[in-house]
Amino acid sequence: MKLTQGCFSFLPDLTDDQIYKQVQYCLAKGWAVNIEFTDDPHPRNTYWEMWGLPMFDLQDAAGVMMELAECRRVYGDRYIRISGFDSSPGWESVRISFLVNRPPQEAEFELVRQEVGGRAIRYTTVRKAPAHVS
């Protein structure tokens, strides 16, 4: 199951050239770029591990791409994403976030719906082991 999180998630995975162009777009807007990774891609897990510090004041996406290559070397078996943070007054939030690396076998989730007291509905997400393709 292909995980769909962030921008471009329903498109084919981005190439390094496409990632470079997206990062350059973020830098041209003056956004801080950061790289994060996780082995738990659950949608409610918003706190991924940061790879280094956010990259402020960069002018060229090559610096981000060098850090991405190193992150992939160390954590290539995990999900890696790039985010662009806009610190402009009135925004002050992540403006773009997209996956740039996936593990060889992706996890699957199952949503369990349960009716509880007062006809309230409770949802539980169960993470299943990745399906192995032979």
Curated annotation (Swiss-Prot):
GO MF annotation terms: ribulose-bisphosphate carboxylase activity
Gene3D superfamilies per record: Ribulose bisphosphate carboxylase, small subunit (3.30.190.10)
Coiled-coil features, chain-numbered ranges: none
SUPFAM superfamilies documented for this protein: RuBisCO, small subunit
GO biological process: reductive pentose-phosphate cycle
InterPro entries: RuBisCO_ssu (IPR024681), RuBisCO_ssu_dom (IPR000894), RuBisCO_ssu_sf (IPR036385)
Keyword field: Calvin cycle, Carbon dioxide fixation
A Pfam family hit: RuBisCO_small
Keyword hit for Lipid biosynthesis: no
Membrane-traversing stretches: none
Further facts: The basic functional RuBisCO is composed of a large chain homodimer in a 'head-to-tail' conformation. In form I RuBisCO this homodimer is arranged in a barrel-like tetramer with the small subunits forming a tetrameric 'cap' on each end of the 'barrel'.
Function of the protein: RuBisCO catalyzes two reactions: the carboxylation of D-ribulose 1,5-bisphosphate, the primary event in carbon dioxide fixation, as well as the oxidative fragmentation of the pentose substrate. Both reactions occur simultaneously and in competition at the same active site. Although the small subunit is not catalytic it is essential for maximal activity.
Subunit field text: Heterohexadecamer of 8 large and 8 small subunits.
Family per record: Belongs to the RuBisCO small chain family.
Official protein name in the record: Ribulose bisphosphate carboxylase small subunit
